[in-house]
Structures are given as structure tokens and as C-alpha cells.
Amino acid sequence: MIQPDPTVLALALLLDLCLGDPRWLPHPVVMIGRLITFLETLLRRCMANERIAGVLLLALTVTSAASVTWLMVWGSARLHALAGLMVAALLSSTCLAARSLQRESCLVADALDAGDIASARVKLSYIVGRDTVDLDEEEIWRALIETVAENTTDGIIAPLFWLALGGPVAGMAFKAVSTLDSMVGYKNERYLRLGWASARMDDLVNYIPARLTALLMVMVAPLIGLSQANAASIALRDRLNHPSPNSAHPESAAAGALGIRLGGPSTYGGLLSVKQFIGDPLRSIDGQAYRGMIRLMYATTLAMAVISLATAALLRGIHVTQL
């Protein structure tokens, strides 16, 4: 169960797509977040060099998450093979966020459809890092589509990639890196030095998945009534139009497929950040564009599921042959 296993991966996908992250079930990311907070406080007290402290924070968090996952899967499998299978599948499913991404983004979309911009701003603030208090309706739709596009990589394709290659241990290690980046990977006075290692590692572990996401979006676009030609054209043209080395890849493919323009100026913590535009404004950014983005997210997920299951089956076969 610790090795890549297509059965575990298939069950994890079904659990995520059907249930998402039930609010009553303790989530590993919450526990990882608490560990990060504890380690950050400890390292700041014990170490003067924040860059070295940042490396230790990364190493300790990822090692802890991977080790606990390994022990849980190994221990449950020792009790019974079925228990090992279910624990591995459950832990793997917590690395995926397709259903949660749709659910949380849909709350914003529903508020906008109801004409409640104030509520939409508040709900959007829960899932994006930018300031939302002064956003107008189109800016809210833009931010919403951008976060769904970017999180298609972070929350779905990248976890599937690592689960297929390394099973639940690799999947949880990736989740630890992603959580670190979301908590300490900021270029501000507090985290510029402490968070640099986590931010760079997040760039690294998402490097291939981000480009794979863009490729899959281009491939599946015509299957759901979107433009493949424009998706490919904009992805090639605008894939580097972002401070992050990865974010613009899925955003550019999505913008091209939908025929919309993303990017541009945004405010973070009261500071204006002027980003390059991604895509061309061939159509308005509205609820229809958002729903197209959700279709694109799910189509991309299904395409990656096929690739991941095939990869896990191949690696499983190689492992069994070597025994």
C-alpha cells in the first residue's frame, strides 16, 4: 500500500470526487499547519540565521508528514490488508481538492449570481490571497477563475502526479510543501528569509505538473466545447507572464480556452501588484466563463486520472516483478 497502487489511487479519486473534504473529518493539512506554526515559533527562538531555519522548517515538516503517513499505512496494513488499503486511499484522497475547489468557488459564484457582491467579496477572500474588499463584479469573476485555474495544478494535477509516482507518502510530502508555501512562502519582511526554501521547493515540485496541466487543458478543451487552437496559442505566448515560474502555465491555457483575459493589477495587503495580462479579451468574464472553467478543471482531472492510474499500474507491476 505504501508503493504506488492503482487501486488506492482510484479509491482516492472516487472519495475526493464524491465526498471532497468532509468538515467533520480531521484533515492532515490542518495538522501540518499546526506543526508548521509550532516549528516556526521554535526555530525563530533557537536560531538567528533565518535562511538556515527555513531549510530546517522545510526538512522537518516534510519528513514528519511523510513519516507519519508511512507509519499509518504500514501499521494498518499489518493489522489487515483491507485496513491498509482503506487508510492509504483515505490519506491519498486528502491530498486532492477537486470537489473542495468546486464547492468553495461555487459559493462565490452563487453570491454573484444572486447580486450579492458584498458576500461574494467575503467568500472570495477565503480562497485567494489578494485584497477583495474593493473588487467589482468582473474583478471577482477574474480572481475566481484565476484561482480555480492555478489550483487545478496545486490541488489536483500535482497531487495526482506525486501519488502516481510515490504513493500516499509522496502525496503527503507534496501536501506538506504546498502548505508550507501557503503559510510562509511570502516575499515580505517576516517571511522573505524564513520562507525562501519552502517557496523554492514548491516551485520545484510543481514545475512538471504545472506544464502538464496546461498541456492537458489544451488537449481536453475541444471535448467540452472550448477552443483548443486558442488555448494552445495563448499558452505558448503567455505561459511566462507571471512572477511565479508555474502559475501562468495553467492560467494561460485556461484563458485561451475560455477566450478571456486574466492577470493585470491586483492588491495584496494594501500594496498594488501590477502583473502582466494573460490571454485576450475575446469575451466577457462572467458566470458563463466560470462554469466553463469548472468544466475544464474536471475534464483535465479526468485526463490526468487516466495517466496517473496507468503510471501507478506500471510502477506497481515493476515493483511486483522485482520481488
UniProtKB/Swiss-Prot annotation:
Q: What is the membrane topology here?
A: Multi-pass membrane protein
- Determine the domain of life of the protein's source: Bacteria
Q: Which GO terms describe its biological process?
A: cobalamin biosynthetic process
Q: Where does this protein chiefly localize?
A: membrane
Could you tell me where this protein is found in the cell?
A: Cell membrane
Q: Report the leader peptide range.
A: none
Q: Name one GO cellular component term.
A: plasma membrane
Transmembrane segments in this chain: where? 52-72, 73-93, 154-174, 214-234, 294-314
Keywords of the record, alphabetical order, are:
Cell membrane, Cobalamin biosynthesis, Membrane, Transmembrane, Transmembrane helix
Which InterPro entries does the UniProt entry name for this protein? Cobalamin_biosynth_CobD/CbiB
Q: Name one Pfam family in it.
A: CobD_Cbib
Q: Name one GO molecular function term.
A: ABC-type vitamin B12 transporter activity
Q: Does the keyword Coiled coil apply?
A: no
Question: Which pathway does it operate in?
Answer: Cofactor biosynthesis; adenosylcobalamin biosynthesis
**What does this chain do?**
Converts cobyric acid to cobinamide by the addition of aminopropanol on the F carboxylic group.
| HAMAP family in alphabetical order | CobD_CbiB
Say which family it is in. Answer: Belongs to the CobD/CbiB family.
Q: What protein does this entry describe?
A: Cobalamin biosynthesis protein CobD
Species: Pelobacter propionicus (strain DSM 2379 / NBRC 103807 / OttBd1)
